[in-house]
Amino acid sequence: LMVSTWASATSSKRISPCRPRQFLLRAACAVCCLVNVLAAQADEVYLEPTAFVSQAFDGQPPQAGKLWVAPELNARVKDILGNALPLRQKYWRQGERTVWILEAIGRDKPITAGYVVEQAAITRTAILIYRESRGAEVRHPFFTDQFKGATLKRDGALDRHIDGITGATLSVHAISALARVALLLDEAARAKPP
């Protein structure tokens, strides 16, 4: 009787060949869930694009317009961003003020930013949606206020130096590039009748 009890006890401790597979499957599921949770947390909506447009026009936004992006303009945009814009770019215009909602890749994911341009100078910059896992400091006024009054020089560069943020270098470059694009698009929009 003792021998059979000992045999059953030792045999129950044996690991079946299915158990390592179950463990690996459960571990893989846990990792996938964690990645999804982290990815969901990385999408930070700081301000809805429609709210930004409304604020830019004191709650009375005009109808959205479309700017046909000419091949020469798109070539300049591609030099700045590394990719071209769609053939029609949505924007809002009232008098000399234009509003642009633009996206660029920071490190791995798109950053959505809004720019208000008036008389060929940026009057407001806001980070609307930030999807990166790092570098979200670019959303704060201490960074975005650097763009107030920025214009384009003849060579297409901003007329001022934009201070970087440690750990957010690629996001800083993306936001600066989008500022240049917003000014280029504003220039093209002002060249056509309202």
Where are these regions (language model features)?
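Bacterial N-terminal signal peptides
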Residues: 26-36
